[in-house]
Amino acid sequence: MIGRHKHCIALEDFSREEILEVIDLAASMKEVLQRPIKKVPSLRGKMVVNLFFEASTRTRSSFETAAKILSADALNWTSSSSSVTKGETLVDTAKNLEAMRPDVLVIRHSAGGAPRLVAEHVGCSVVSAGDGAHEHPSQGLLDCFTLREKLGTLEGKTVAIVGDVSHSRVARSDLHAFPKLGAKVRLCGPPTMMPAGVERLGATVHTDLREAVDGADAVIMLRIQHERIGDPLIPGTREYSKVWGLNAKKAADWLKPSCVILHPGPINRGVELSPEVADGPRSVILDQVQNGVAVRMAILYLLAGGAGEEARA
């Protein structure tokens, strides 16, 4: 359990204390990643099934790595090689996999709400690895962990989220999590890529990049979610990059010296971020990847029965 939760589906459901429970444990889990032998017996005998209906590099390999470091058995399942291609429904697929007695189902799906639907029909814990444009809770948690690690705290800090906010599940999870930890959130991007009603969550909305990043402690750059967009919402990527992309000159002129830059990946280099910025000293993008393993170790440990036992990490 994570606090009162059997599942990890949306950070909208999580309290400040529940978010801190995960990232505090992730700090301990990260220590395991620094060891010569990256293996602990915490989840020996447990099974984690990764159920991915969308392409993924970082998230799926991160969950698989997290499970294996904790000594759990990890099964990777993809829709292209399954009975889904023969017309099997999502719920039937999940029920059949649950019959194999996994402890955790990790699911990524193009439809918002798919993980919650699965959770209503299975008895094991369910973790959302991203559902449509709804949420990506483990990414939100690793962003919280990375920012706390780099900034010391999120309390009183300002985080700018820039790009295709409307179609970004990462932005939604971040937007639900950051204010609970005391951070102020600024959203910036084209008006056509800005969701309605975000002000009720405490965020301010900007269309001018310079204004949005002025004085910010961290900037999270988002790619354009072409796979979720029907009609074009911007004139073109070149024009987008000129207005909302972050290059070395803008970073040097507009960002304060201590500001760090994050990106959930994959990066469209030369569009939202120039290579010089993505690979520069402000970038903590690869730290996010490493922290993602630690955070997912914490999630699996708490949901698969590690809570209440002696953590042997």
UniProtKB/Swiss-Prot annotation:
Record organism: Anaeromyxobacter dehalogenans (strain 2CP-1 / ATCC BAA-258)
Enzyme Commission number(s): 2.1.3.2
Protein name, per record: Aspartate carbamoyltransferase catalytic subunit
GO molecular function, one term: amino acid binding
PANTHER family: ASPARTATE CARBAMOYLTRANSFERASE, ORNITHINE CARBAMOYLTRANSFERASE, MITOCHONDRIAL
Reactions accelerated catalytically: carbamoyl phosphate + L-aspartate = N-carbamoyl-L-aspartate + phosphate + H(+)
Pfam family name, one: OTCace_N
Gene3D superfamilies: Aspartate/ornithine carbamoyltransferase
HAMAP family listed in its UniProt record: Asp_carb_tr (MF_00001)
NCBIfam families to which the protein is assigned, alphabetical: asp_carb_tr, PRK00856.1
Keywords: Pyrimidine biosynthesis, Transferase
Transmembrane segments: none
Similarity section: Belongs to the aspartate/ornithine carbamoyltransferase superfamily. ATCase family.
InterPro entries reported in the protein's UniProt record: Asp/Orn_carbamoyltranf_P-bd, Asp/Orn_carbamoylTrfase, Asp/Orn_carbamoylTrfase_sf, Asp_carbamoyltransf, Asp_carbamoyltransf_Asp/Orn-bd
Role description: Catalyzes the condensation of carbamoyl phosphate and aspartate to form carbamoyl aspartate and inorganic phosphate, the committed step in the de novo pyrimidine nucleotide biosynthesis pathway.
Binding site for L-aspartate: K86, R169, R223
Residues the entry annotates as binding carbamoyl phosphate: R58, T59, R108, H136, Q139, G265, P266
The keyword ATP-binding appears for this protein: no
PROSITE patterns, per the entry: CARBAMOYLTRANSFERASE
Keyword Transferase appears in the UniProt entry: yes
Pathways per UniProt: Pyrimidine metabolism; UMP biosynthesis via de novo pathway; (S)-dihydroorotate from bicarbonate: step 2/3
SUPFAM superfamilies recorded: Aspartate/ornithine carbamoyltransferase (SSF53671)
Domain of life the protein comes from: Bacteria
Quaternary data: Heterododecamer (2C3:3R2) of six catalytic PyrB chains organized as two trimers (C3), and six regulatory PyrI chains organized as three dimers (R2).
GO biological process, one term: 'de novo' UMP biosynthetic process
One GO cellular component, as annotated: cytosol
